[in-house]
Amino acid sequence: PDHVVEGVVIPFGIFKDHMLQKMPGQEYSYWAYLQSIFSDEKKMLEDGIDPKDVECMTLQDLNFFRSQMEEIPLKDEFVKNLDNYFQKIFGRSIGNIPVFLRSDTNMEDLPQFTGAGLNLTLFNVLDRSKILDGIKKVWASPYTERSYQWRQQYLNNAEDVYPSILIIPSVNVDKSGVIITKGVSRGDEGDISISFSKGVGGAVEGQSAESYVMYQNGTSELISPGRETKFRTIPATGGSTFQYASLNRPTLTKEDLEALNEMAKKIVTQMDKVTGEQSAYDIELGIKDGKIWLFQVRPFVENSDANTSNYLKSLDPEFKEIYV
């Protein structure tokens, strides 16, 4: 608990409650319109219409629906309660503390979920209006093309996806990254893989991060050095800035590695007790002034199909990297 920030959760039910409002100028609700999109899709497929054409029409409808969701009115009672919880949990009102809005959906509870990052997360938002607008944008994010396409591969009822939002105060960490509690490169179940970069959002955003394997005997091996010469910081005024750093020193010290290794072992022990089974975990964390801050723990699921999906690859831009 000492390594986790306090937070406010906007649960699935708040999203559904807002979805039951009528759409502007219509007699039907947002929820009814969403259901009609997928029922029309099923009917067109049953009628023998080319699946590619059906998908194109569905994506057009979802694009319109997403634009409507981004403008959905927030209920006065909800905003009032949110104000109260900000004051109670954070000690400040909305607009006076920068926060992260982290998305979550009920499909992420599925054991085979491998779609981390499909939905929107907003970081270091300070302005009150941007926080409230951000809630709408996070609610709308499961209806992007990428998120829809992922759900179609795994869910029979892709329309029944409910987003929740975790609001946590921003921590301007010195370095951040991920831990996988198994040896990713060699597949050894007893090893721990660590990838870190300077600043916030390290390793999670696909950076060329500094990566290690921590072996069961306590020794470590550098798999790849960090190659990022700039890193993101999040000032108290909101938003983000970039700073530049030399590569003459490692991102993680020996003490960092030992502390991260110990933290990972404690998390595995605790999570295995909670779940009642032994698993590998994907852990997001950061380090600020030598203290580890834990941001997220989820089961680590390897998805070989996703790694070879031409569709998913086609949605990712190609970047050219030049190293000097």
Predicted regions and their residues:
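Conserved divalent-metal-coordinating catalytic cores
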Residues: 1-2, 6, 10-19, 28-32, ...
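Two-metal-ion RNase H-like nuclease active-site motif
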Residues: 165-168, 281
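N-terminal beta-alpha lobe that positions the nucleotide/phosphoryl donor
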Residues: 1-166, 175, 252, 268-272
